[in-house]
């Protein structure tokens, strides 16, 4: 079994762990509706970069 030669200090341990935190998804505001969506993804209404790229069912 591996055993450390010198004990790591709390500071060194915590500095190593400083990059382990998770970040939330990056969101953008849709130009046409003002709705939030994931960046580089088509919004739920079928728009991408201000252009209609996917036909969606109408709610009528």
From Swiss-Prot:
GO CC terms: large ribosomal subunit
Record keywords: Ribonucleoprotein, Ribosomal protein
UniProt feature, compositional bias: Basic residues: 7-16
Pfam families: Ribosomal_L32p (PF01783)
Highest taxon above the source species: Bacteria
Single GO term (MF): structural constituent of ribosome
GO BP field: translation
Residue ranges the record marks as coiled coil: none
InterPro entries recorded: Ribosomal_bL32, Ribosomal_bL32_bact, Ribosomal_zn-bd
Disordered as annotated region, ranges: 1-60
Classification via HAMAP family: Ribosomal_bL32 (MF_00340)
Family: Belongs to the bacterial ribosomal protein bL32 family.
NCBIfam families given in the database record: rpmF_bact
Name recorded for this polypeptide: Large ribosomal subunit protein bL32
Lineage: Bacteria, Pseudomonadati, Pseudomonadota, Gammaproteobacteria, Thiotrichales
